[in-house]
């Protein structure tokens, strides 16, 4: 009897801890995302993945999406087809995050390069300045300011709820 009650209690405590941990992660992500809104894009100077150009934050003033990705990121592969679709309507700049150049280039050659260019952030310096916790993360940037941010995969639902209304508002102004 005592052993059965003890097992039940342990299971209840474990499940409660999992639920609490999950809710804290979700809340922290939402708070962090909201805090990042309307902040300037950090100052940076990075080479493009093809090493042909040096890009600074001053070069990026129009409306664009900044997508943090890596060849080792499974979720990046999942969201890639959707990003290809939206790249037909809005420019997407890639931020290749803590990746080997050859792996990243091979990944784009295999899946298709939807980016107007990819910044090569081997050490994750710009990603750190952006508050990135991992790939993928996606930012909507307008006039040098971050106006929307999402941690994780961007799909139709996320795109519609977090990004599209802001893009439409800008296009209608």
What are these regions (language model features)?
Residues 45, 58-59, 151:
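Short clusters of small/polar residues that mark proteolytic maturation junctions
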Residues 77-111, 122-128:
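Structural microenvironment flanking redox-active thiols in thiol-disulfide oxidoreductases
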Residues 42, 60-64, 87-92, 113-116, ...:
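Short glycine/proline-enriched coil/turn segments at helix->beta-strand junctions
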Residues 110-114, 122-170:
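Thiol/disulfide oxidoreductase modules built on the thioredoxin-like
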Residues 54-77, 83, 139:
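Short active-site neighborhood of thiol/selenol oxidoreductases, capturing the structured segment around
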Residues 47, 74, 84, 147-148:
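Nucleotide phosphate-binding site architecture
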Residues 1-47:
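N-terminal targeting signals for export/organelle localization
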Residues 46-47, 116-121:
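Short acidic-hydrophobic, aromatic-tinged amphipathic segments that line or gate anion-handling sites
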